[in-house]
């Protein structure tokens, strides 16, 4: 008798392709010299005006410390814990996190930052000492290795890099790869930082190094200046509006990778579009193929040896979490080899049931979303693709 969808999912060691570590308040102050740089080192302190803990760079208010700690919180986002200590300990405690993973049937989690890459543009805008910013990047990368070491085999750390300085980036690639990082978190819109666009050949030595080291490039939504939608319509509506539209930035990044010739020039380099969903991808690829054929690209650019959809199938992955029918349809249209599953834990709209969330537990959601798919497709999406991409032992 053929196994049911539920049986296949229950037998699969799920690799969650997008989760976040809520950075502890002393992450940087415990690793970067406050004797040398004082309060310029990122730190958390109470802000009387907003009545909450904030991350500060010097005297500049950057980010609510509890903003991303939405899992099991009792208020709808953008409301959030006012103090880190008020949030669920599984958001930031590595040992407690493993218990959460076991409860929800997740074998391993790929780890992304909150403040680590998303707010670095603030430092660049402050013209901070480059040595300080580099020290912060290294401190985060080292912290993540130490955090992951509490549960070997359960966490997949991804490095951040000082991308504004390519020489420093090349050095950090080697240092963090040797320490155990499995991929690179990279901004999708370099123009937000006053740097050349992704497709500019300025980045070619970075792509070449990542390709040689077999390190994937991971584009997480929001890793730049986040455009806000519907802000005049109310906090909760604006939050939903913005969260819905952020995938567009990653769609533009995929177009840059393909039309900009990056996939063509670096055929063994893998890319991941993170927290951006998958339902829209078949349309975008069909559109890219159509435009490719009907804009004379094949005739005028013989260097492109594949269609856009074929470059995607060879080198680009994307992740889904809440989708049901659109995820199943995308898998059926694209094939299962480049689709990953994520929960976005512990972000507010991730797959964590709670008093202010309609989410089901991950496996319960997957029973519906993947119902009827062949066993090899389910295993690809839940385990095999991520294991291959991040070079994990089975």
Where are the predicted features?
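Short glycine-enriched loops at secondary-structure junctions
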Residues: 112-117, 221-227, 347
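Short glycine/proline- and charge-enriched loop/turn segments
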Residues: 124-129, 233-243, 358-365
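Short aromatic-enriched loop/helix-cap "lid" or pocket-rim segments at secondary-structure transitions
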Residues: 26-29, 121-124, 229-232, 283-287, ...
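Surface-exposed, active-site-proximal loop segments in enzymatic domains
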Residues: 76-82, 117-132, 167
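Active-site mouth loops of central-metabolism enzymes
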Residues: 82-91, 127, 155-167
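Conserved residues at the C-terminal ends of beta-strands
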Residues: 23, 112, 187
